[in-house]
Every structure is written in C-alpha cells, then in structure tokens.
Regions:
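Juxtamembrane helix-loop junctions of ABC transporter transmembrane domains
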Residues: 11, 34, 43-50, 82-133, ...
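Transmembrane helices of ABC transporter permease
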Residues: 24, 28-39, 152-178
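Transmembrane helix-loop-helix hairpins at lipid-water interfaces of multipass membrane proteins
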Residues: 29-89, 169-174
Length: 178
C-alpha cells in the first residue's frame, strides 16, 4: 500500500493547481500575463521621462534660455503615452484574465454538478444542502479571485523589479549594481 502512494504523482497545490484548472483557457491566461508585463514596463516610462526632463534642465541651468522646449515636450508626451499604455495594457490583461476565470468557474461548476448527480442518494441525505451550496458558491468562486486578479498582479510584480534594474543599468551602471 505504501508502495502505491510513492508511485502516484504528488497532488498540485496553489499556483500550479489554479493554472491546471484554467488549462482550458491557457491562451487567455498567458496573454493576460504578457499584457500585465507590458503594463508594468509602461508604468516606468513616466519616471524615466521625468528623469530626462530634469537632466535637460540641469544641463542648461542657470541659463534657461538655452532650454530645448521641444525635447522637454517630447519627454512629456512620452510620459503621457506611458501612462495611457499602462492603463490600456492593464485593462486588457484584466479583461483576458476575467474571461479565463469565468470560463474556468463555469467548467468547475458544471463538473461539480455532474459529480453530484452521480453520487448515491444516501450520501446527499447525510449532508446539509448548505454544505453543497458553500462548495458551489464560495469554494469554487475563490478560484476567480486568483485567476482574474492576483495572477496579472503577480506577473507585474515579477517584471517590475527587472525593468527597474535594466533602467538603472541604462542610466548609470553603478546604480544598477547597487
């Protein structure tokens, strides 16, 4: 008996289990992660633009008549594009993740209802209807929060520090090393 347990694959939990449940919508989940990563990259564009605007001002200080207004304007517009890109990419990341989450919830609820139909009637008599309702409503619904919200945020939180290090290395390698 102990030998049988060693040969069985270990049950997946956490992130791996949620991704396994959403495997029918794998394309949407990965697209959501990709768009969340792009949103994280765009979120740094305004800060980078501010850095270059300040740098431009400091190069000409104290003679502000030498200030290149078109360069500052370009960096300002780029900051605006970065903000809009962040909003748009994050919106579509959440849209994709919500479609995947609701599709997964539908499949889980249908599978649960099908499973309940095949259980002997005597089993249903020993359980309260509230227990089955709790499984259907609360437990299955908890998967939605992870797939729809936490997964895109998780990807963005992994990408953001990498982007920050790349930006710091690009500005001055000593910042990136520190």
């Amino acid at each position: 008996m102990a030998q049988q347990n060693k040969n069985q694959p270990k049950a997946k939990t956490g992130l791996a289990r949620c991704l396994e449940l959403a495997s029918g919508h794998k394309g949407l989940v990965f697209l959501s992660g990709f768009l969340a990563a792009l949103a994280a990259i765009c979120s740094f564009v305004p800060y980078l633009s501010i850095y270059y605007i300040i740098r431009e001002i400091l190069f000409v200080y104290p003679d502000m008549s030498l200030l290149n207004v078109s360069t500052i304007s370009t960096w300002g517009w780029l900051a605006l594009v970065g903000i809009l890109g962040n909003i748009v990419f994050y919106f579509f990341a959440l849209l994709c993740s919500h479609i995947a989450a609701f599709g997964t919830l539908y499949e889980l609820k249908v599978a649960f209802a099908d499973h309940i139909m095949h259980i002997p009637l005597g089993y249903h008599l020993t359980l309260s209807s509230g227990k089955l309702r709790k499984i259907m409503d609360e437990n299955i619904e908890s998967v939605e929060k992870f797939i729809a919200h936490q997964l895109p945020d998780f990807v963005a939180s992994l990408v953001a520090p990498l982007v920050l290090v790349i930006i710091l290395l690009g500005i001055d390698w000593r910042y990136g090393v520190v």
